[in-house]
Amino acid sequence: MENSDDIRLIVKIAQLYYEQDMTQAQIARELGIYRTTISRLLKRGREQGIVTIAINYDYNENLWLEQQLKQKFGLKEAVVASSDGLLEEEQLSAMGQHGALLVDRLLEPGDIIGFSWGRAVRSLVENLPQRSQSRQVICVPIIGGPSGKLESRYHVNTLTYGAAARLKAESHLADFPALLDNPLIRNGIMQSQHFKTISSYWDSLDVALVGIGSPAIRDGANWHAFYGSEESDDLNARHVAGDICSRFYDINGGLVDTNMSEKTLSIEMAKLRQARYSIGIAMGEEKYSGILGALHGRYINCLVTNRETAELLLK
């Protein structure tokens, strides 16, 4: 420990620096000592407990959860919205607000942004800030349309166009379905100029915003209602844990080849992995397996979720 004179000097310097907001250069001039000495004594004051710094975590009660998610799953970003005492729609809205702030912070001029479909992605898009000037970004769908199996407000084209309107961005829409009747039709569409234009953006995607599917979903977006009983039974038999853009994987993140694989028009998971930011937005116990599989497969490197789901993932 320092002698009493050193301690008094450290306290004096700390008081000037932290309480009176003086710069280290100003303190050095006032006390007649080198600036490097000021820096060294401030550091020593923290190390010896003379100076303590407290962060008020009430302003972000979920910060610890975010840090743990990043560490456990190697994420670039994790955002956890509060869920205590909130109805499901309120939780979804809060998650969308937090996700929109994240996207707004991460976007760079010239970025290509890809969108999937669904409620969670819609919540994020609706909360994107309305820009008065162009962000010079391009918004594109990364999956075909759901062929009337989703409400129009959740359609990938609705979300892509809506985001572009808010960001003052260029947009391209998908004039093809996500799931075809057979591989021959799919292959024919893939030869069209329209599909080639859309899919060319997938090769250089900067940011992806994706919802996450799961076999436990019980509402109108469940796999049985969306893909039909035969395909749904096939997914269950193959122990599928989740999907992104109708690309299926198991709980360990391994891709699962299904009866639909050769009939699907959406971004390949390898290309999704290459995006600078692949942002998954999902919440709820029923989405747990889908989120966990996506994290294990590293199909997303950013996660936006709620507190309850974050705690499940960290168990």
Swiss-Prot record:
GO molecular function: carbohydrate binding; DNA binding; DNA-binding transcription factor activity
DNA-binding region: 24-43
Pfam families xref list: Sigma70_r4, Sugar-bind
Top-rank lineage group of the source organism: Bacteria
InterPro entries hit by this protein: ArsR-like_HTH (IPR011991), Homeodomain-like_sf (IPR009057), NagB/RpiA_transferase-like (IPR037171), RNA_pol_sigma70_r4 (IPR007630), SorC_transcr_regulators (IPR051054), Sugar-bd_dom_put (IPR007324)
Annotated keywords: Activator, DNA-binding, Repressor, Transcription, Transcription regulation
Example GO BP: DNA-templated transcription initiation
Family membership: Belongs to the SorC transcriptional regulatory family.
Alphabetical list of PANTHER family matching this protein: TRANSCRIPTIONAL REGULATOR LSRR (PTHR34294:SF1), TRANSCRIPTIONAL REGULATOR-RELATED (PTHR34294)
Function: Positively regulates, in the presence of L-sorbose, and negatively regulates, in the absence of L-sorbose, the transcription of the sor operon.
Stated name of the protein: Sorbitol operon regulator
Species lineage: Bacteria, Pseudomonadati, Pseudomonadota, Gammaproteobacteria, Enterobacterales
